[in-house]
């Protein structure tokens, strides 16, 4: 389940062209639609569509933050344009909102709003770097679908996003940066869960950079494959079969 997603959906019903949900919330939506369970997730990863943003959306967003009485409101500094809001007083609201934008100061502050810088020693979302790349940004928005009134992306699109997030976190860990091993593991495990509902006859043409990332991901995870895929609903499926089919779906090297 995704705490507060119904509140979010109702509040932003008139702004479905301004954003797309990715990450764990997107996994929940596509798996739930297929009648499958997904791990609990407490945050909403929101990609803003800069071409459609306006003052009305910014006003509506700040109204949502104020209604939920979020205790912590943060903004990244520098190149990564990232907003984080968490720990609302109203328990009916999502615990955390993480917004990704490609233009600075997209959320004009309300008169009494204050954004503190995200601490340097706190890593930004593993999905934040994705939006700095034109290929990923267009890939997400060109693939947008609607599930129960919420704009998101289908499972075959979430898989490459999760693969890139896994690669980024793994690279940081290998460079000696502090990374929660569970954050790395969840992205890989989510891909196996999503595999249950990816249509085997799908064929996805990936932009060059995303294709390269998928290649790198499959090569890396093949070095240390899980002993069983049963926890992900794939008890009768071998790891090599998953890799082979993903290569076919995304037109990768066999």
Regions found by a protein language model. Give the residues of each.
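Compositionally biased terminal segments of proteins
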Residues: 1-254
């Amino acid at each position: 389940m995704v705490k507060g997603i119904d509140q979010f959906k109702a509040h932003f019903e008139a702004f479905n062209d301004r954003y797309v949900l990715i990450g764990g919330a997107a996994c929940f939506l596509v798996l739930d639609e297929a009648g499958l369970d997904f791990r609990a997730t407490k945050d909403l990863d929101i990609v803003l569509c800069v071409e459609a943003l306006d003052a009305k959306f910014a006003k509506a967003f700040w109204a949502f933050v104020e209604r939920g009485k979020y205790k912590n409101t943060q903004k990244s500094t520098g190149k990564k344009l990232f907003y984080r809001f968490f720990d609302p007083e109203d328990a009916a609201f999502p615990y955390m909102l993480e917004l990704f934008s490609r233009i600075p100061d997209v959320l004009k502050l309300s008169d009494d709003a204050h954004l503190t810088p995200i601490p340097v020693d706190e890593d930004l979302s593993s999905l934040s770097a994705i939006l700095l790349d034109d290929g990923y940004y267009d890939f997400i928005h060109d693939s947008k679908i609607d599930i129960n009134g919420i704009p998101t992306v289908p499972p075959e699109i979430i898989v490459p996003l999760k693969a890139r997030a896994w690669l980024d976190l793994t690279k940081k860990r290998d460079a000696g940066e502090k990374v929660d091993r569970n954050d790395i593991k969840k992205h890989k495990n989510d891909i196996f869960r999503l595999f249950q509902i990816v249509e085997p006859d799908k064929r996805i043409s990936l932009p060059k950079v995303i294709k390269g990332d998928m290649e790198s991901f499959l090569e890396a995870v093949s070095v240390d494959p899980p002993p069983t895929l049963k926890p992900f609903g794939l008890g009768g499926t071998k790891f090599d079969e998953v890799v082979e089919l993903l290569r076919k779906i995304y037109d990768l090297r066999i």
